[in-house]
């Protein structure tokens, strides 16, 4: 089978910030203006990323990198991420978010409430990139010149991030998973897996795939992005067993019958979580907090681990009943992970 078109991968805002930080440190210490830098990523790949501009002063150096989204429809494509570096008195690397970087105003997100929206994974990426240049103490300031304006066109405010964009990315790489042509890629990958396995694990994203790899052979796991329903339909015609493994936010959309989980196709995450929580018999006070939360992650902070398990079991059972309608002759399984990777529910396995 031939894929008719090759899709371009992109880089995350976190990878852009890491590249800008490394270029700024090279400028600061070596007085050198690099046109590209190579950075390490959490998945072991190294990325060579173009640097748009480097400005060097006696005590500070700044570099700019443009976010590149590949063939993903992304409003952040082309956005400039600017990092400035100066020496720190101790040997630590301090990372500060300023103009255009959002601030976290609600609990449950990857960054702590009150901090700037720079994920722990990105902070580690930046530190690793800088440590390839020096072991000296460095202060990095991240700015996104047009971040506050662009953020108004994103969902950041709805989840409790205000004043700018988030600096995110679990792998550093942005995969083109949201367009129609990506289905052909999924079909090809399923056919490859079929040659060696009679089952397949459908994982919407990087974290789901990572957690699933602790339970299954990584070679039988396929990342499908938003196209969950289409991928399950394709897989149900090829395998004896199809396992859907994901995190709560994505799978709560499937619970509501939204099988393409791209934001443009609808959103019922908190409504679904509230509904399942009612069915699970959670206390009224907890239900109120859940329904008023801005994100699933925040809502989870109001629930005990046992309550999460009870609610997610209801969600998994409903999802299982939905996907069984695709093919009655297939053994389907649904696994829902907590945000720390622990399995909250496992139905049909």
UniProtKB/Swiss-Prot annotation:
Query: Top-level EC class, please?
Result: transferase
Q: Which GO terms describe its biological process?
A: anaerobic cobalamin biosynthetic process; methylation
Q: What is its EC number?
A: 2.1.1.195
Q: Which Gene3D superfamilies match?
A: CbiD-like, CbiD-like domains
Q: In which pathway does it act?
A: Cofactor biosynthesis; adenosylcobalamin biosynthesis; cob(II)yrinate a,c-diamide from sirohydrochlorin (anaerobic route): step 6/10
Catalytic activities: Co-precorrin-5B + S-adenosyl-L-methionine = Co-precorrin-6A + S-adenosyl-L-homocysteine
Record-linked Pfam families: CbiD
Keyword vocabulary terms for this entry: Cobalamin biosynthesis, Methyltransferase, S-adenosyl-L-methionine, Transferase
The record's listing under InterPro entries reads: CbiD, CbiD_sf
Matching entries from SUPFAM superfamilies are given as: CbiD-like
Q: Name one GO molecular function term.
A: cobalt-precorrin-5B C1-methyltransferase activity
Q: Which family does it belong to?
A: Belongs to the CbiD family.
What is the name of the protein in this document? Cobalt-precorrin-5B C(1)-methyltransferase
Question: Which organism encodes this protein?
Answer: Saccharolobus solfataricus (strain ATCC 35092 / DSM 1617 / JCM 11322 / P2)
Highest classification ranks of the organism: Archaea, Thermoproteota, Thermoprotei, Sulfolobales, Sulfolobaceae
């Amino acid at each position: 089978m031939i894929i008719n078109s090759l899709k371009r991968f992109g880089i995350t805002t976190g990878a852009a910030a890491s590249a800008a930080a490394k270029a700024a440190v090279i400028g600061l210490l070596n007085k050198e203006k690099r046109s590209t830098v190579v950075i390490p990523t959490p998945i072991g790949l190294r990325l060579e990323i173009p640097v748009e501009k480097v400005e060097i002063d006696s005590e500070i150096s700044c570099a700019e990198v443009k976010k590149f989204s590949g063939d993903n429809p992304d409003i952040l494509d082309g956005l400039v991420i600017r990092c400035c570096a100066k020496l720190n008195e101790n040997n630590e690397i301090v990372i500060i978010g300023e103009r255009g970087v959002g601030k976290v105003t609600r609990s449950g997100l990857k960054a702590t409430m009150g901090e700037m929206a720079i994920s722990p994974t990105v902070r580690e990426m930046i530190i690793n990139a800088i440590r390839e240049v020096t072991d000296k103490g460095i202060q990095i300031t991240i700015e996104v010149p047009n971040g506050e304006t662009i953020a108004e066109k994103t969902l950041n405010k709805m989840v409790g991030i205000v004043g700018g964009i988030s600096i995110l990315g679990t792998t550093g790489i942005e995969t083109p998973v949201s367009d129609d042509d990506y289905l052909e890629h999924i079909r090809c990958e399923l056919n490859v897996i079929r040659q060696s396995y009679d089952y397949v694990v459908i994982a919407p994203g990087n974290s789901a795939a990572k957690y699933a790899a602790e339970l299954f052979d990584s070679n039988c796991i396929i990342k499908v992005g938003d196209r969950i329903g289409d991928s399950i339909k394709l897989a149900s015609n090829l395998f004896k067993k199809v396992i859907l493994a994901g995190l709560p936010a994505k799978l709560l959309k499937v619970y509501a019958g939204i099988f393409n989980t791209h934001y443009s196709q609808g959103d019922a995450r908190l409504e679904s979580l509230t509904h399942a929580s009612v069915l699970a018999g959670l206390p009224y006070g907890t239900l109120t907090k859940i329904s008023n939360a801005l994100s699933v992650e925040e809502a989870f902070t109001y629930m005990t681990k046992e309550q999460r398990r009870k609610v997610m079991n209801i969600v998994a059972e409903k999802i299982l009943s939905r996907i069984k309608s695709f093919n009655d002759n297939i053994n389907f399984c649904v696994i829902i992970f907590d945000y720390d990777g622990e399995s909250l529910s496992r139905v049909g396995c």
